[in-house]
Amino acid sequence: MSRFFYGNDSDSDSSGSDEEELYSDEEVEQSEEESSEEDASSEEESSEDEDAGKAGASRFMKDVSDSEESEEEDVVKVVKSAKNKRLEELESTIKLIDNAQKINDWAVISSEFDKMNRQVVKVLQSGPVPKIYVKTVADLEDFVNETVAKQKSSNKKMNASNAKGFNAIKQKIKKNNKEYAAQIEKYRADKDSYMESDEEEEKKPAIAAPRLSKLERVEAPVAVAGDDDGFETVVRGKTLQYTPESILKHLRVIVESRGKKNTDRLEQIKTMEKLLEVAQTPYQRIRVYLTLISTRFDLSTTSTAAYMSVEQWKAAEQELSTLLSVLEKERNYVVSEGAEEWEDDEKQPQVAAGETFYIPGSIVSYVERLDDELTRSLQHIDPHTAEYIERLSDEKQLYTNLVRTQIYVEGLTKLEKTELRQDSLNRVVMRRLEHIYFKPSQVITILEEGTDKALPSELETSITTRGNSDAQTLVQTLCNYLFRNSDGILRARAMLAQIYFLALHDQYYRARDLMLMSHLSENIANFDVSSQILFNRTLVQIGLCAFRAGLIYEAQNTLSEICGSGRQKELLAQGIILQRYSTVSPEQERLERQRQLPFHMHINLELLECIYLTSSMFLEVPLMAQTSSSPEMKRRVISKTFRRMLDYNERQVFTGPAENTRDGVIMSAKFLAAGDWKKAAEMLNSIKIWDLMPQPEKIKEMLSQQIQEEGLRTYLFTYAPFYDSLSISTLSTMFELSEKKIAAIISRMISHEELGAALDQVNDAIVFRKGVELSRLQSQIVTLADKSMNLLEANEKTLEQRTQGMANAFQRDQGAGARGGRGPRGGGQARGGPRLPGGQQRRPGGQQFGGGALGGAIKA
């Protein structure tokens, strides 16, 4: 053939090599003869490129290389079937395992063992178990046992990678060899005769096909494919036949592929859905449902989405509901944690009447995972959209499954009470409690009624009473059960949930007493973060309850710990405040986001701030009036947050009308401090956020009454020094309070020593005592003395910080004949300065300033 047809490039060669792959669709490796031929042809092509610059006539003359190529074209090519190629791959893997055994490389053995098992699965599709595979796994098990014995007798330890591989093989080999126990026994009975016996299916001989020229291969690929007598093209995607007998085998393959890379879980889900259609026995259906639900959860774990898709969640929820129905009907099958797995995939367990067969699994874990996935989706969905409301409606089905799971596990616990089952029952009861403790009674009643209708009528529970939808009774019953049967975190969370529920329903004193008796405030730092968040939420709810009851001091005192920090969002898990120079790692931030509560569980932070500032106003304004008229009192601050906002507002040159809730409270405080309680009440009641509270008119009435009382206290503190006596009827007219109420307020102020006065009940007047308060000059002197002492302390602290380790130089004891710094020997003065009268040396850092002449005058 003329070389003109080849040209100067290798396009025809590459296309020819592509067509050669038509001889076998699943050909993985080229034979050594083919690779050598291709190397030779590539060398010829390179030589042709080198001779490209020759004269035109010499290009078309037949050279020695042409004769060599024509001889190579006559060499035959060996075509191998897909089965033989798989066997060759298996043999090469076994050789690697044998070589690794010789050098005790367990890391290689472990990886190649997994590879070998994957190859055997393909080989089994077209024939029986290869005997060489049986020999390898049997010898490998013996080798593992020998290595274990050597490890016990010798002190030499494996390195980390070897030990990891050895432990993996030790676990895998026993489980793997159970499937081939019969073949392994035959092999160990007589190894030589087992390996020399003929295979059950003889290998078909490879057919020698003549090697075609490159041009013929390009022109007639179909003819070549048709000349392979005895072979047929293997098509990928062969349809599998699912039968009831093969269900357990398919499930084992799916379970073993869990956690491995490049696993198509959607395809596995489709496979199990088909297995459900052919499943005939309850055992088969239970096994398929358990694996199917787990695979759906794995799908969400490996995906890039932040939460499980709605379709997959609803499918898993429906499958869990169906699984519970099967378990409720088939009482002789029990899904239990810690049960032994059924190893024989060839046959199903036969359960006699009255016996119970345990299947490994955890229904409680499934319903907990469904709950977590629903919460995660609610965390990421915009709460101001219809999608959030629609997603929140799925809670009803989840709550029904929670109750069914509780009844199912409760029945198992009655049959055989173990610590593991009791723990599972406690977990599911806690989950149920967490779904209702923050809801109003009306919502809980509707939810319970819907759940009772959805449950089968034959299901009964002893923990709660079916048909009783009273919310308070339900919460009390669930909490009492957890108090009796759990301890640690679950018990503490149940206590917090009950306190939250009581505070939400205006039972302040019961909630407060439970919180105090539980001593949770002392131990909450030792609990996990989610429990600390629940504690903070409960504390806030108690404060809100106290405010609704008109207990202003208790409300401010309770809310100060949360609201005074300025980190309400973080402490209540309702948002993350990312600071500019934050040292939080991405992992910590991710965990923090996972702990965030869904929007429907949030406490209104604007309402919370308004209540805290209002409570602080009622306490701070009278206190400010008291300290301004009585400078001898030690200045104390109840709410730094309120004081800071008030100072900022007073520094403004121009103050416009209130634009938000915070401005409304501050302006109301300024009116109250000025004595205009009517404007203060009007401004405070005009805040629209009070409408978000239950019974807003009652709240506004309570606020108006509170402003009247605190306005009276503020007036008395401010103008007491200027009165000798004051009529109660006058105060009653000014503040529109009854005389009896005014007398009670004044009596309380006198008993608390807040006001130096006495009640004249005959004349219905207040008689103020004179001489109790300091004069204006005395007040200024006391203030000056306090400031001087503070200045001295600050100076001495600064001196100590600068000298630090040199403090001893200022307080050396000077004995007889000792050196006094740079002074003369003997009884010279120390460098620390002159001694005080009586031989006592002045010590730095103390408070020796007595106020000088001014202090002496005060003391006199």
Swiss-Prot record:
Ranges of Low complexity compositional bias?
Answer: 832-846
The Swiss-Prot or TrEMBL record annotates one GO molecular function as: RNA binding
Compartment annotation:
Cytoplasm
Q: In terms of one coarse class, where is the protein primarily found?
A: cytoplasm
Boundaries of every PCI domain copy: 599-773
Q: Which PANTHER family does its entry note? A: EUKARYOTIC TRANSLATION INITATION FACTOR 3, SUBUNIT 8 EIF3S8 -RELATED, EUKARYOTIC TRANSLATION INITIATION FACTOR 3 SUBUNIT C-RELATED
* Family the UniProt entry places it in: Belongs to the eIF-3 subunit C family.
Q: What is this protein called?
A: Eukaryotic translation initiation factor 3 subunit C
* Organism whose genome encodes this protein: Emericella nidulans (strain FGSC A4 / ATCC 38163 / CBS 112.46 / NRRL 194 / M139) (Aspergillus nidulans)
Gene that encodes the chain? nip1
